[in-house]
UniProtKB/Swiss-Prot annotation:
GO molecular function annotation: copalyl diphosphate synthase activity; magnesium ion binding; terpene synthase activity
Protein's name according to its UniProt entry: Copalyl diphosphate synthase 1
Source species of the chain: Selaginella moellendorffii
The keyword Ligase is annotated on this UniProt entry: no
Similarity section: Belongs to the terpene synthase family.
Cofactor(s) for this UniProt protein: Mg(2+)
Location of the motif DXDD motif: 287-290
Length: 739
């Protein structure tokens, strides 16, 4: 496995302008450029040779392993025109024209979603050139009229005076407009690298019309870089940097490449603008897809970044990927939706973007149209559906990883001006490493659970209804699904024992135990003497002894991790939590409701003892007051309590956030109060995310535990619902190896 890690690390350390497959379509345009010295020869004869040497058996050019009619015909016509321009390769041209005549009617049957970028602009222009060259194809085919109509609609959205004077996406397809535009104006929109919006075809056309030296330099560099051919777009540096980081994270292997990922994101951050970014540095045109991916990754890694960039893509009540676009791309809206998930309080633009993107994606799901115009991937519908059904605040990392390992493919194909592949974004090495890592962690987690089972069997907890073996498995799953790294084995065991114990205690006092028993348990925790338990029930004695043994064991381990005694801190954690349970019990028995503020301030989630105990075991040394002075625990408790109350069981119906909210706002209906509490829960999750990502005294690894805990409570909000929802998740993460 470590050989795979080093291979990936080598890839990451070699990132530059992007690894991308070549394009026959763009290479054909470069091959058409006449020699700038005035001789009747091509400026790039090596590109002409590449065309003649790379025709496929059926007479077309393009991706050998994937046939899309639009793509193949567009490339075939471009190559035929290039060869005919220089009166060479007659047999190759004849074979290409046969392919075009035979295949053109199939364009009417192919989904227009898979039409190459700018096809409706460049293809009609090539048809006119083919006619002028007297190439033998059907110029009366009905499908051509449809394409001409699409061209007219697009040009109406972006008028020619705009194209010639302002950066737009049509700079990427100027070869389709070369007879009508003013090249003296357009060349002023040239990118610093000499290209026209990083399009080799568009730049080749500009070179033909202007002889611009920077255009020539750009194409010379590309032809040399790609061995006599060119890609459909270049560079793709920001795109590659971002999508690699995204894939590594979703595959669960990013922890092996912490420094390399930081370098990649530092690079992207360097080119971030207040209007967003595009696929390449220095682009005069930004797009919502790359901007969304960059925003989400940068923010989640702690970079200071403003969501105001999304105003670039807001048009009234809608959001677009590009100004003047013909239609929305599923992946663009998918990434916009994902970006909205890292929203901080008060960020209205992200709230609006997320709402719009979700509505769009839900509509596509209902219509069974979750496929995209920019990528052909293994399971895009599954990716989108998982994101919609599992928002970030209610998603467990290892479950998402397990799902994405099944969805990731090494051979995804992207749709640009022609089909292309990104070998550093999609490759078999990533997948092989992800599977090996997942199976390694799963095997370790199974051994740890066996250790927990032995502890359970040796305890007396099984006599209580709330301490079932299935609940033990489920609490361990919550740890394995969030703090999964092999080196954090003690943290997982401590988390599991603590949450298992707090859930069982909570259930006992909800259904069976008396207020006096709870008070007795708290008194025993205060005395902390297992040999002097006072006059309390047998069950309280058992609960205290089990709690005592757990805390004592954790205290011994904690000394090794912290270099000091943490026993007092661990005891205080349980005393605080049990006292909150007592306060809640007294409120339920009383006729006087607390205010919502009082209620939330006094609420301590059942998962709190697990989180606050585990922070000492994640590899960070904590000063005595670090945790006490942090507001993050209260934020987690508030968010968790609000979520639990919106899914409340009947036993809690007498006292929860909704009943209190109704008491304070009697004019509201129960459903209206529920909506208000749900909105409050979402706002508190945003506050918790903000607190987690901000620098502070508490280390990041510790803060992440509190965020993970709140997410767990969002996934499994009610203790009586845990088993039903968890069973399949436990099986996938703990029991099933990845094949």
């Amino acid at each position: 496995m470590w050989e795979l890690v080093e291979t990936v690390r080598s890839m990451l350390n070699s990132l530059h302008d992007g690894e991308i497959s070549v394009s026959a379509y763009d290479t054909a345009w470069v091959a058409r450029v006449p020699a700038l010295d005035g001789s009747n020869t091509p400026q790039f004869p090596m590109c002409l040779n590449w065309i003649m040497n790379n025709q496929l058996e059926d007479g077309s050019w393009g991706d050998r392993d994937l046939f899309l009619t639009y793509d193949r015909i567009c490339s075939a016509l471009a190559c035929a025109i290039a060869l005919k321009t220089w009166n060479t390769g007659d047999k190759i041209v004849h074979k290409a024209l046969e392919f075009i005549r035979k295949t053109m009617p199939k364009m009417e049957l192919e989904d227009s979603t898979h039409m190459p970028i700018g096809f409706e602009i460049v293809f009609p222009a090539m048809i006119e050139e083919a006619m002028a060259l007297e190439l033998d194809i059907d110029y009366t085919a009905p499908v051509l009229q449809t394409i001409y109509a699409e061209r007219k609609k697009k040009l109406e959205r972006i008028p020619m005076n705009v194209v010639q004077n302002y950066p737009t996406t049509l700079l990427h397809s100027l070869e389709g407009l070369h007879k009508t535009i003013d090249w003296d104006k357009v060349i002023k929109l040239q990118s610093p690298d000499g290209s026209l919006l990083f399009s080799p075809a568009s730049t080749a056309c500009a070179l033909m019309h202007t002889g611009n030296e920077k255009c020539l330099q750009y194409l010379n560099n590309l032809v040399k870089r790609f061995n006599c051919a060119v890609p459909n777009v270049y560079p793709v540096d920001l795109f590659e940097h971002l999508w690699i980081v995204d894939r590594l994270q979703r595959l669960g292997i990013s922890r092996y490449f912490t420094q390399e990922i930081k370098s990649a994101l530092d690079y992207v951050y360097r080119y971030w603008t207040d209007k967003g970014i595009a696929w390449a540095r220095g682009s005069p045109v930004q797009d919502a897809d790359d901007t969304s991916m960059a925003f989400r990754l940068l923010r989640s890694h702690g970079y200071d970044i403003s969501p105001d960039a999304f105003k670039t893509f807001q048009e009234g009540d809608s959001f677009v990927c590009f100004s003047g676009q013909a239609g929305q791309a599923v992946t663009g809206m998918y990434n916009l939706y994902r970006a909205s998930q890292v929203m901080f309080p008060g960020e209205t633009i992200l709230e609006e973007a997320g709402s719009f993107a979700r509505k769009f994606l839900e509509g596509k799901r209902q219509e069974n149209q979750l496929y995209d115009k920019w990528i052909i991937s293994k399971d895009l519908p599954g990716e989108v559906e998982f994101a919609l059904d599992n928002p970030m605040h209610a998603r467990l990392e290892r479950l998402a990883t397990r799902r994405y390992i099944d969805q990731y493919a090494a051979d995804d194909v992207w749709i640009g001006k022609s089909l292309y592949r990104m070998p550093f974004v999609n490759n078999p090495i990533f997948l092989e490493l992800a599977k090996a890592d997942f199976n390694m962690c799963r095997a370790l987690h199974r051994k740890e659970f066996q250790q927990l089972e032995r502890w359970y069997d040796e305890s007396s907890l099984s006599m209580f209804k709330g301490f079932s073996r299935s609940k033990l498995e489920q609490t361990f799953y919550s740890a394995a699904a969030t703090i999964f790294e092999p080196e954090l084995s003690p943290a997982r065991l401590i988390w599991s024992q603590c949450w298992f114990l707090s859930l069982g205690i909570n259930e006992y006092f909800d259904y069976q135990g008396s207020t006096k028993e709870l008070e007795d348990l708290i008194n025993n925790v205060e005395r902390w003497n297992v040999n002097s338990l006072g006059n309390c029930s047998a069950k309280v004695k058992i609960l205290f002894v089990e709690l005592y043994n757990i805390v004592q064991n954790h205290s011994k381990q904690g000394f090794l991790y912290q270099g000091r005694s943490i026993g007092g801190a661990l005891r205080e954690i349980w005393k605080t939590w049990l006292s909150s349970l007592l306060q809640r019990t007294k409120w339920k028995m009383s006729d006087n409701y607390p205010t919502l503020e009082e209620y939330l301030k006094a609420s301590h989630s059942s998962i709190e003892p697990a989180v606050r105990s585990t922070v000492y075991f994640v590899g960070e040394t904590l000063a005595t007051g670090d945790l006490k002075d942090s507001a993050i625990c209260q934020m987690m408790n508030t968010a968790s309590r609000l979520v639990q109350d919106t899914h409340t069981d009947k036993v809690d119906s007498s006292l929860n956030s909704i009943t209190i909210y109704l008491e304070e706002n009697p004019q509201l209906t129960e459903s209206e109060a529920l909506s208000q509490v749900q909105a409050l829960a979402n706002k508190n999750m945003q506050k918790l995310l903000y607190e987690t990502l901000q620098p502070g005294a508490l280390p990041q690894a510790c803060k992440q535990l509190f965020l993970n805990a709140a997410r767990i409570m969002n996934v499994f909000p009610g203790t009586n619902k845990v088993q039903a929802k968890l069973s399949n998740h436990v099986k996938r993460v703990l029991s099933q190896p990845v094949l």
